[in-house]
Amino acid sequence: MRIIHRLTQYQRLFQKFGENLASTTVSEVAGLLFCSERHARTLIQQLQANGWLSWHSQVGRGKRAQLQCLKSPDTLRATYMQAFLEQGDHQAALELAQLEPERLQALLNPHMGGQWQADSPVLRIPYYRMLEPLNPLTATGRAEQHLIYTLHAGLTRFNTGCPQPQPDLAHHWQVSDDGLTWQFFLRSQLRWHNGERLHGQQLLQTLKLLRSNTRSQPSFANILTITLPHALCLQFTLSQPDYWLAHRLADLPCRLFHPDNPLLGAGPFKLATFEQHLLRLEQHEFYHLQHPYLEIIEYWITPNLMVQSTDGSCQHPVRITIGQEEDFPLARPVQRSMSLGFCYLAVNQHRSNMTSQQLARLLMLVQTSGILEELSIRRGIITPSHEMLPGWPIPRFASDNDSPLPAHLILIYQPPMELKSVAEQLKVVLAAQGCTLEIRASHDKQWKDSHQIEKADLLLADHLVGESPEAAMESWLRLDPLWRGILSPSQWEQQQKTLTHIQQIELASERHHQLREHYNDLMLSGLILPLFNYQYQVNAPPRINGVTLTAYGWFDFSQAWLPPTAT
């Protein structure tokens, strides 16, 4: 864009001459801007016409002209940033933002938060890291998963704060008396984000893709066939009853995208821009449910400019502040919640070959060493876990046996950053017991396969739990390679039988009870130990309303709204 190039050229002049009156020649300006003298004269005339500089030349060979820069580059960038954003030219604004990375935070701050521009409510969020591609079959990050729920619809969906699956692309569904046939009735007039009609045959193709994908296949393991007996009816025929099915179809692995393009969905927002420094969502004008209040949501990504706050939490991914810098004194915690998900320690027993006494001693040391309590005080964003889910207490381990721990153990930890601290502190605790802990970092946010897990005795990772906690915990046992890695073949087979039995129980409370008992057995056997939960928080200035935290710690984009600004 020409204006970006002009700003770059003017920046060179300003760096050379500043705001003071300076003596120079056209030849010197041409050398500074790496152009011909003829082009330099044209540029000087243009900058003078724009009011950026003054130029007074004198007649005669060798005479020097008087040049003065009238505006700072920062002022010009701020002016054009405002103009581009008001015009909706986010591409130009993005190019302008990339012009001076070291000044990006100051440049963007006045435009962050909620604003009305061109009669449309816009929410801009500064974000601390690059985002993964928003492919439902590959994305692993918490922010990415939240965005995928926003972009893609399913046959069913979870509303924020409600654990029961609700209608989405399907307006109703019915189940046969034997629980083996489920029919989902599609809404008429459904459309993809590009405006094309959404057809049942396309959903059938997408479901076929999901059934063959490694990540989502376990969610469909009990399904014999999926057919389209009518243009607006999808029918699932099961090998055994599965009363989690409506929950599964609302979950991330079953989000329905266009069969030819995994980034094209039918959710409340559509993906307009996905670039290194900017993600832009726009309202889906053909959305089949209540339309969001916001027209546009933008993530401005500035990973190198996020400064640690005094309390160590401002830029942490579980703490989100919406607004401009001058709003921060007014920003208040509008929503707080304890994460249902948790960070955990898993033990690969058939690799470590620890005895039950050694295992009890190891877990007792984790629970009584004060590692988690110290981390809670130091970071201020976590709480040591006492329950796996509300009403699912974690056993306390004790050991009267002084049998030594293994001389050497290998631990692999994943993000988030707190798990690195836990690993380092645990290394000190175990060293005092004569056990050397070898720590290895994994940069994956999820376990890729069981081979990765088989290389470690101990594993530290984060488990996200969605709006329907029990359904999420059941899916975890099916979907996460962790369990294939830490369970012996016989344990894995027994777990599959247990899950098959539980899924056939029609009464939800009894399903939940038996699932809780299974997890209690896993904890008592020392396979899994929840460590801590996060304290999710969203801060916002008074003018931003309807901020509702989701189970993933983000806020529901469909509920937030801004009152119109006075004219």
Question: How would you describe each model-predicted region?
Answer:
Residues 21-27, 33-39, 51-57, 399-462:
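Ligand/substrate-recognition segments at binding pockets and active sites
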Residues 48, 58, 361, 365-398, ...:
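Detector for C-terminal structural segments
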Residues 130-144, 196, 246-251, 539-558:
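A structural "hinge/loop" feature
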Residues 18-22, 41, 140-142, 172-214:
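Aromatic- and charge-enriched surface segment that lines or borders ligand/interaction sites
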Residues 282-285, 335-361:
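A bilobed periplasmic-binding-protein/Venus flytrap-type ligand-binding module shared by bacterial periplasmic
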Residues 66, 216-262, 266-278:
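Surface-exposed binding/hinge segments that line
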Residues 126-175:
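N-terminal lobe/hinge region of extracytoplasmic solute-binding protein
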Residues 286-328:
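Ligand-site clamp/hinge motif
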